[in-house]
Amino acid sequence: MLKKEDRIFTNLHGEQSHDLKSSKKLGDWDNTKALLNKGKEWIIEEVKKSGLRGRGGAGFSTGTKWSFMPKESKKPSYLVVNADESEPGTCKDRDILRYEPHKLIEGCLLASFAIGANSCYIYIRGEFYNEASNIQRALDEAYKDGLIGKNACGSGFNCDIYLHRGAGAYICGEETALLESLEGKKGMPRLKPPFPAGFGLYGCPTTINNVESIAVVPTILRRGASWFASIGKPNNTGTKIFCISGHVNKPCNVEEAMGIPLKEIIEKHAGGVRGGWDNLKAIIPGGSSVPLLPKSLCETADMDFDSLKAAGSSLGTGGIIVMDKSTDIIYAIARLSKFYMHESCGQCTPCREGTGWMWRVMMRLVKGDAKKSEIDQLLEVTKEIEGHTICALGDAAAWPIQGLIKHFRNEIESRIQ
C-alpha cells in the first residue's frame, strides 16, 4: 500500500482549492527554473531511469518515447497531451484536469523543454466542459505569473500551451486520429509509419502523451528517479491512479503503488465488493477495452502491466469495473459491443463491418436465440478483426468478447439451451 508521503496527487479529491496560490502550497511550480537549467538530456534520462510507462493504456516507456524526437530539425516540434478520456470505466484524467491542473501545466512545460517543443496542445474531451474551464483558468494564471509563455519561469525558454476542445468522438483518443482532429480534419487514425515523432502534427515532429504521464513528471524530477523506481515492482514502477466502479460499496479514484493486489485495492479503498468478496463474479481490470477476469483469477491478480498480461488481461487505463453475481455478464459485454460499434470511425472494413456484426450476435446470445455453433463463429470473427485494423479499436472491440467466451462459455451455452 502506498505511503501517504509518496502520493503525487495530494489534491486528487478536490479537498483544497486548485488555484495557483494553493497549488504552490502543495509543491507545484517549486523552483521549476532549476529543473529546466539542468538541461534536456538530464530530464529525459531521469524519466527513463524512473521507469515511467505511459499511463494511457499502452505502457510504453515515456523517456524512450521522448528520445525518439529528432535532436536537430528544421521544422518546429510539438507536444500534444491526450486529455480525450472517453474509455468506459475510466475517469482518472478528469480528476487531474479538475483538481490538479497546475501539475499538468508544469509537466507540459518540462516535457516540451525536454523534446524541444515551443508549442504544446492539450486536446480535451468535448464533454469535459468544467474541466476545460479549470485548465483554461490555470493557464491564464500561469501566463500572468510568467510561468509559461515567453521566458518561461525566467529560464530563457519560450513555451506556449493551448487548450483545444474535442467534439466527443471516442476514436480521437487514438493518437493519430487526435492529430487529424487537431488539424481540423475528420478524426480518423493514420497509417504508421510514418510515426508522429517524425511526421506528426502539421507534418512536424510530435510527441503525444497521456495526462497522467505528463502530470507526474515534475514530481519525479524533484524527488528523483530512484524514488519513483523504488515504488511498485521492477518494470512496473511508480504510482498509478485507479478508478474503481461497479458493484463496490464506495466507488472511487485512488492513487496507489503499481503492483498492488486487485483484491486489496478493492477492499481497502472501495469498501469491498457489494455483498462481500464471495459475491464477486468478474472484474474488468483496465477499462472496457481489456478482457475480463473471473473471480478465481481476481484472487491472485496484481495491478500492473506484466501481472495482468500473464493473467490474460491488461492494465489498460486502470479502470476497475467490478461485477457481482447479480450481473447479466453476457448483456454487460454486449453493451460494450454496442459502444465500439457506435464509436468505430468506419475507415477499416474489419472494424466497420465486424463491430456491428459482433453486437448483433451478442444480442442474440443475450436473448438465447443463437445456435451453439455461433459461439465459435463469434470467437473466430474476433480473431479476424484483432490485429487487422489501422488502430487498436478493432482489438478493443474483440477482447471483451474473447474474455467472455473464454471464462463464461458455460453460461452462454446454458442460456441458448
Swiss-Prot record:
PROSITE patterns: COMPLEX1_51K_1, COMPLEX1_51K_2. Binds 1 FMN. Binds 1 [4Fe-4S] cluster. This is NADH-quinone oxidoreductase subunit F. Its EC number is 7.1.1.-. It is an enzyme of class 7 (translocase). [4Fe-4S] cluster binds at C345, C348, C351, C391. Keywords: 4Fe-4S, Flavoprotein, FMN, Iron, Iron-sulfur, Metal-binding, NAD, Quinone, Translocase. The keyword 4Fe-4S applies. Its cofactor is FMN; [4Fe-4S] cluster. FMN binds at residues 166-213. GO terms for molecular function: 4 iron, 4 sulfur cluster binding; FMN binding; metal ion binding; NAD binding; NADH dehydrogenase (ubiquinone) activity; quinone binding. The keyword Zinc does not apply. NAD(+) binds at G54, R55, G56, G57, A58, G59, F60, S61, T62, G63.
